[in-house]
Amino acid sequence: MRYAWPMQSADSLEQLRLKLAQFSSERDWDQFHSPKNLAMALVVEAGELVEHFQWLSPDESVNLVAADKREVAMEMADVLMFLVRLADKLDVDLIEVADQKLERNHLKYPVEKARGRATKYDKL
């Protein structure tokens, strides 16, 4: 499916994947989108996200002013887009692997042992 600009909002990871692939292809950026480069870009964007919280108290981090919240949202979008692009390049279904990981975590962190605790699974 080809999208015209401005693109309609994506309502699934698959639509977002397709839109990002088209965006990259139209600009001949696939040559730069190796898994290594995408992973590095993802980490850079995650670092930019963390910068917004670096010196805030836990309460301040929950109660961001609107302008800061918008900037945080934009950094979150950058992280998501690089993650989706990386998954596309490595042919990883993010929903499928997230479900698998959640199931593993369910087994590692049983409610009766982990509830209300921030302890690693091997120390429960």
PLM regions and their residue ranges:
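Flexible "arm" and connector segments at domain edges
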Residues: M1-M76, L80-L124
